[in-house]
Amino acid sequence: MSQKGTVQIFNSNKSPLPGVQLTATDAPATDTDANGNFQFNFSKQKPGMAIASPNVYKKGYELVNKDMINGWILSKKRPLSIVMAPEGTIEESKNKYYSISVAHFSKKQEKAIEEVNQLYIAQKISLQERSDRLKAMAEESRSFMNQIDQYAEKFARINPDDINAIEKQVLELVNAGKLSEAIELYNKSGIITQAREKLSQKTK
């Protein structure tokens, strides 16, 4: 069973990456050629069987889509597409999205806290109600930080070279600081992506 594939550079208009070293269980080690192409020649595996994530290495680069290639269903017709990025790219994008989202949320929270304090000063709410509202905001802040820790890296790994319309909207929302909306759309995008992969895996 031969599995063909390509290695491309993240966010580069699908530029090929030559000289990548690849190994997989039950297949001899191989390297990408000048066009980023490679081929695994498995001795026992057959089309339709799942494989563990191949080991992918090139000095100065990091693997971007490990989750997608882990458990890959072998196919004679469908190439294994691997994406790599210069080291530090994902962390840089993650920090960028983190900073944008925190700044947007903090501004929103500061405005809400000021409104609550003004209501209390104007004696439109009681001390207890003021305390309850501020506690609710603090809980909202904790929930927000948990969400951003969970999703910032996932957003950073979305490859602009190969995204659907919903994933494009996700990145636009994140860049606008609208994390909750981005998370909702990202989860929808995950369902669509999984469905698309299952359909494509039927063609072996």
PLM feature segments, named:
Residues 2-17:
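Structural motif
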Residues 3, 24-26, 159:
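Short, small/polar residue-rich loop motifs at catalytic or cofactor-binding pockets
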Residues 13, 20-31:
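Short amphipathic beta-strand segments in non-cytosolic proteins
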Residues 27-41:
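Short, acidic Ser/Thr/Gly-rich low-complexity loop/linker segments typical of extracellular
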Residues 47-72, 179:
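A short, solvent-exposed loop/turn motif at the edges and junctions
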Residues 69-103:
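Extracellular beta-sheet/turn segments enriched in Thr/Pro/Gly and aliphatic residues
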